[in-house]
Amino acid sequence: FIAGTYGVGKSTLCDKLCRKLNIPAFSAGDLISEINGETYGKNKVVKNKIANQNILISAVEKKLSLYPTFLLAGHFCIFDKSDEVEILPEFIYEEMPIVKIILLETDFDRILRNIKSRDDKSYNLDSIKNIIRLEREQAEKISSQLSIPLHIHKMDFAESDIKQISTIIQGSAT
């Protein structure tokens, strides 16, 4: 499970890892969108997070019937329509066969720039700091509760990211 806040580089990293490791990669948001028809482009607003998590569980089960291993990019926390942080329901992680959690992090100013560039959306600094903090807290909590190894990776936005994460995925890093 490749986790991290908006704008941390999950999709870009997963695309590169997919090619390097020959493992399919999917975005949780894209899997949900394929079924419920909602698009989570620039606004990122989720209408029903419980229903969406149930959709995700079903979509992951379908993908597992096709692929024994794949990368799933997603979140532990999201913003609501008021840009307040919402923690996603914990049952979702219990229902998915997650082998490792790789939490991507970077500086809040980089996240703000990435989101502005990609989505033309501006979040206030406190909201970004809060979601970064809560994303890590939830990753640590889920890792501990479910005994799933957690790897926290500080993004450099360079080839070194691909090399380090590939090593973690392939199991030669602790």
Model feature map: region roles:
Residues 121-162:
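Small-molecule kinase domains that catalyze NTP-dependent phosphoryl transfer to phosphate-bearing small molecules
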Residues 5:
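P-loop (Walker A) phosphate-binding loop of NTP-binding proteins
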